[in-house]
Amino acid sequence: MNNREITSLWSRLIVEELIRQGCGFFCLSPGSRSTPLTVAVARNPMAKWKTFPDERSAGFFALGHARATGKPAILICTSGTAVANYFPSVVEASMDCQPMIILSADRPFELLETGANQTIRQSGMFGSYSRWNFRLPEPSAEIPLQSVLSAIDHAVEKATGNPPGPVHLNVPFREPFEPELSDLKDPWLAPVAHWIDSAEPLRRCSHAENVPHPAVIEKTAELIKASRQPLFIAGKLDSREDAIAVGLLAGSLGIPLYADLSSGLRYSTHCKPWQLAFQSPAFLEHYRPDMVVHFGGQLISRHPGAAIRVSHPGNYLVVKPSANRYAPDHNVTLSIEASPKLFADALLRDLQNVSLPAWKGPVADEFFTFSEEEIEHYCEDDRPVSEISVARIVSRLTGEHDGLFMSNSMPVRDMDLFAAATRQTPTISIAMNRGASGIDGILSTAAGFAEGLQKPVTLVIGDIAFLHDLNALSLLESSSVPLRIIVVNNNGGGIFSFLPIAAEKDVFETHFATPQHYSIASAAATFGVAHASPKTNREFADTCTEAFESNESIVIEITGSREDNVSAHRSLQHTINMLARKFLKKQ
């Protein structure tokens, strides 16, 4: 067997084993050194793939695909700086526990650190952000093929383990790269003959859910029974099953549940919009939780954390599926590594016949009702569409089984705060890049999320984040499902207008707000994507309704000013705080 045959077979086995492990979607970036892997993907009838000229975009697309499927998409690139372009998406995947597998082609050993062209130190380049990094040997008939298959199996195991995350396999190749069919009866293949004849991977892996210890359930139940004002928090939850279980627990016990947008429960009619209350100083003067059970990961808003710092609850429990640390204020008293669903189910069984102290539910309900009526004023048909009404209207119009992706900065905060709760159960697939909370790669991630879901996805994004990932619009032409992109164009970084630096007029506009004067419509036209620019809430709702019924991607641009947005937010918040004072007098 010659070198071309060995290299071709080596690559075919790697790709085939990944597919047998259920990792059959490949994000390919063109390059010479990665030719054997690319050809192996292209010629495998079971492989699904998409080609990306930009590795940075590919990395975020793979991230979005994993968010939708729970399985790692496979990234393949050539040697050199190509693999470094994955770094931002690797950080996000690592921080937010999303599976990812990178196969980076590399120069062989004899060319490393010699000044050879397009040769860098690739092995271990992602440092602590990878769950496992490993350099495969150069293809050789001296290497047992079982060891190659076993390495691939372990890569999948680490990428999908607890916690999931990125895995980096460095795959060196010597020239020539051009494919050549090999003789499958060669003695080198004899030890894996059974594998060749089957459709199974060499080794499967299994990950069990963390079952809560009965003693921990009992302790938690006792703490809740002894509490005067308990609070449940649902942070980022990884599954619909987790969300349903946590929502059922809170509803059955009558304990307030702060449901973050990332929990999947924010749209549930069973959950009150506690975001409105926790932004009200007047409300927090009267509601001071003395015991908190926090399910899942981090929150979008800083206000619950600030309120808890003030109330100093004697017990703050965090229930999360892995041992990753969550204690940004260093006030967690018990960290519980367990499945949120299994923990919530067990806790409900323990407490279902227990009478708990009543809290002022009717007063709070009245406050929430009137507060949401104030938000609805901003959504009146003939009013100009605003960042507040965008969140409210999109939350109402998103289809029952569609996807929603929220960009960082203001869009995700507005949706968390102003969304309308219109669903009995959490059916909308909601995603966001909140691991490291950057604005980079948002369009690419949303496109990957839609591809993974195989459902239409609505993306709400600011103008700066849109421009940051503009080349991702090229992905939509070959997409199998539409992406509806709502661009909130306030001519710059709107979130900075809410920060104290906005008062420093001599530096704010040029160094922080960074106004841009590019045409969003022209950008969309360049990539052949439809564009609309509604001016009123009625026009926006009609445009969204039409877009949501179409199978075509579209950019819907909402223009406004940062100054008007800050004024509207502060005015609405003042009104809500006044409502809190009014209704709290009834207690």
From Swiss-Prot:
Keyword rRNA-binding found: no
Domain of life per record: Bacteria
Cofactor note: Binds 1 thiamine pyrophosphate per subunit.
GO MF annotation, one: thiamine pyrophosphate binding
Keyword set includes Metal-binding: yes
Required cofactor names: Mg(2+); Mn(2+); thiamine diphosphate
Pfam families (UniProt xref): TPP_enzyme_C (PF02775), TPP_enzyme_M_2 (PF16582), TPP_enzyme_N (PF02776)
Catalytic activity line of the entry: isochorismate + 2-oxoglutarate + H(+) = 5-enolpyruvoyl-6-hydroxy-2-succinyl-cyclohex-3-ene-1-carboxylate + CO2
The protein's annotated pathway: Quinol/quinone metabolism; 1,4-dihydroxy-2-naphthoate biosynthesis; 1,4-dihydroxy-2-naphthoate from chorismate: step 2/7; Quinol/quinone metabolism; menaquinone biosynthesis
Gene3D superfamilies in the cross-refs: 3.40.50.970, TPP-binding domain
EC number(s) from the headed UniProt entry: 2.2.1.9
GO biological process terms held by the UniProt record: menaquinone biosynthetic process
Enzyme class: transferase
Keyword terms: Magnesium, Manganese, Menaquinone biosynthesis, Metal-binding, Thiamine pyrophosphate, Transferase
Quaternary organization: Homodimer.
Family indicated by similarity: Belongs to the TPP enzyme family. MenD subfamily.
NCBIfam families the record matches: menD
Function per UniProt: Catalyzes the thiamine diphosphate-dependent decarboxylation of 2-oxoglutarate and the subsequent addition of the resulting succinic semialdehyde-thiamine pyrophosphate anion to isochorismate to yield 2-succinyl-5-enolpyruvyl-6-hydroxy-3-cyclohexene-1-carboxylate (SEPHCHC).
Protein's name according to its UniProt entry: 2-succinyl-5-enolpyruvyl-6-hydroxy-3-cyclohexene-1-carboxylate synthase
Record organism: Chlorobium phaeobacteroides (strain DSM 266 / SMG 266 / 2430)
